[in-house]
């Protein structure tokens, strides 16, 4: 399952550590295992996107998306690279979800996927 945070420009680390990842950051800023986590049922992929969000970056200024369609294209290319590195996961069911503005990128990603 691919998780896309809202924003735009919201780091998916928020979803990972605050909402539904296997661990959460508690009030004393230590990490605690979450008893109910999506990762107990699904293999999770948390992506900081577009480039420049969270820990995502590029050394080339031309690598930054200038519109939502470029963001979807970059995500498509990132996932293609992911599956090149981990082909054993290709047979797994694949879900894409997100919240707030991340939901827009979910729709754009599938539109791109449909036409590719």
What is the meaning of each model-derived region?
Residues 97, 104, 115-116:
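Short, intrinsically disordered, charge-balanced linker/junction segments flanking boundaries
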Residues 1-73, 80, 84, 109-115:
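N-terminal cap/lid subdomain of alpha/beta-hydrolase-fold enzymes
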Residues 87-101:
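Alpha/beta-hydrolase fold nucleophile elbow
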Residues 102, 106-110:
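Short helix immediately C-terminal to the catalytic nucleophile in hydrolase catalytic domains
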